[in-house]
Amino acid sequence: MIRFLVTIAVLLALPGLANAQQFPSDLFNTQIDGSVAAWIIRTFGLLTVLSVAPGILIMVTSFPRFVIAFSILRSGMGLASTPSNMILLSMAMFMTFYVMSPTFDKAWTDGVQPLLQNQINEQQAVQRIAEPFRTFMNANTRDKDLKLFVDIARERGQVVMTDNVVDYRVLVPAFMLSEIRRGFEIGFLIILPFLVIDLIVATITMAMGMMMLPPTSISLPFKILFFVLIDGWNLLVGSLVRSFN
């Protein structure tokens, strides 16, 4: 996890550091020249990027698919707050670490380590660190979603490819759209058996004339029992992890 955090921190910090100049000694003089103003702007931009680091992490990893699947599971079982949001987010985060570990390791080996050893400069490090994430997103993005954003960008006159490589402005939203879609596809398969249990219980209670008794309160124990008997967590997590390319 420490390697992951260092990799993300370097990836976020390098774009600002790559163009940063040395801190000027006359920063507090009454007359501020252009270099000082540029340094202030770059520092402000770097702090802004670091403040949105969690959002950047969500955009380029497997986190959305896990969160959507776990949330739909909880809703399908009829549990309002069990497991809690903290537990679901923690599970999604550590499952993301597991799925993304080859990507993090490659980014660390190819980009961070050579930079720390002064073998490459900051610009080369940014490219090497970002390349494993590009490979992961390319492998898990639907062609239809990618084509959608490519067509929209071309309609606006934007350059979407450089040296046969798709621009991140196109790849990242296409990847997020694909992740959300797959999350809902898996969620549908999760919620379907619970819906069947609800329908069976509702039919039985209506046949018995128990109109005032909510069917969901009766079906909840059966849904929990069903999920435990089929080892649902094992099946769900295994299916989610194997669904990534």
Swiss-Prot record:
GO cellular component, one term: bacterial-type flagellum basal body
Cited function: Plays a role in the flagellum-specific transport system.
UniProt keyword Membrane present: yes
GO biological process: bacterial-type flagellum organization; protein secretion
Family: Belongs to the FliP/MopC/SpaP family.
Main location: membrane
Protein biosynthesis listed as a keyword: no
Pfam short name (any one): FliP
Protein name: Flagellar biosynthetic protein FliP
Transmembrane segments: 4-24, 44-64, 84-104, 186-206, 218-238
Keywords: Bacterial flagellum, Bacterial flagellum biogenesis, Bacterial flagellum protein export, Cell membrane, Membrane, Protein transport, Transmembrane, Transmembrane helix, Transport
Native species: Agrobacterium fabrum (strain C58 / ATCC 33970)
Cell compartments where the protein resides: Cell membrane; Bacterial flagellum basal body
Membrane topology according to the record: Multi-pass membrane protein
